[in-house]
Amino acid sequence: AGISLFTDSEMRKIFLHPDGSPISEGQRVHQLELGSVLSQLRIKGAGDFYSGSVAKSLAGGASQAEGALTIEELRAFRPQWRESTSFSFGHHTFHTAPPPAAGGLTAAAIFHHQAEGDRYLDAPVGERAHLVAEVSKRAFADRQNWIDGNNAAALDLNRLQGSMATYRSDQSTSPDMLSPPPKRRLENPASTSFITMDRLGLTVSCAVTMNNLFGTGRVVPGTGILLAASPATLGNAATSLSPIVLVNHNTSQLFFAAGSAGGAAAPAALASVMRAALLEDMPLREAVQASRLHHGGMPDIVLTEPDIEAQEYESLDRRGHLVAKVPEIGRVNAVHCPGGVPRNPETCLFESDRRGYGLASGGIL
């Protein structure tokens, strides 16, 4: 977030050492004021956050933190339940978040392109990197049909299948040949994901954002609570949110759950792990650690991680792709239970991404 983060005195109290150096990842953060707020909520209940003493502290302190939040707005807040968007995978069903979140839907489209008719598994090894780039390009183009609030279905499998008519195994497809052509979108990468599940298979995949790194960079005095930035002024980070779960409704089993972060590259990262774990039967740790590539439609560039294999690079270059290496492509947290939960919880594997400082922990109860 840079040095500008420490223009706020409350932020300096939390995230700087006594000598003025910033706390780094992996070091302990002490938030006594936030702990006090959480204790109040445990004693008085969640309602105190919206209409009680915590609400008054937030509303009163927001202006001091250069924010705008009234107690009337807190009282009027209501969570909104929305049905998930789903699609079939064999006998199972994927569920992901509906618009305005677009990351899970785009990852689902990338995955469907590869799974349909065993397209990825049947492709020669030397063609697979090219195939991944091409289906990613088409998935990002297809979302132009619905991402701006148009009435088109967000995950139309027939429409996706039709987009493969222009695919050539030996040559990159120009984005101008896709309908609609993809657009370049600046997406805020400030988000994170987490997954939690119990031995009964009850599972939540969650993706959240403060619309900017550390939100506004301002802490409400006396609370330890960071104010979120406005999506209208700093870019809609909700676009890239990418939670997904895979279940079998007939047998009431959970098989896979994941979430990714990383802005525009989040869907490609998630789809990469889904493909490796669910199509290639790769152990989850290997699936999450494996090198990734990303094509966001526009600009017409394939982004790869530094450890891409030479033969994959040559395959892309030979087919006319412009290739650029970047330090990392997204971060994924995932749980994979090949035997299903609650039926075979001992088959579950859980993994956080080596590209970040996440945590994966659990066991059989």
What is each stretch, according to the model?
Residues 270-274, 296-365:
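C-terminal catalytic or substrate-handling cores of phosphate/nucleotide-
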Residues 129, 140, 145, 149-152, ...:
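Extended C-terminal subregions enriched in glycine
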Residues 44-51, 56, 259-282:
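Alpha-helical support elements that line or immediately flank enzyme active sites
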Residues 1-45, 49-51, 55-98, 102, ...:
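Noncatalytic scaffold domains of N-terminal-nucleophile
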Residues 68-70, 197-256, 263-267, 280:
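Active-site rim segments in enzyme catalytic domains, especially the processed small/beta chain
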Residues 81, 188-191, 213, 239-241:
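Short, small/polar residue-rich loop motifs at catalytic or cofactor-binding pockets
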Residues 6-7, 77-78, 184-189, 236-237:
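Short loop/turn motifs at secondary-structure junctions and domain boundaries
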Residues 16, 116-209, 223, 322:
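Internal maturation/activation junctions in enzymes
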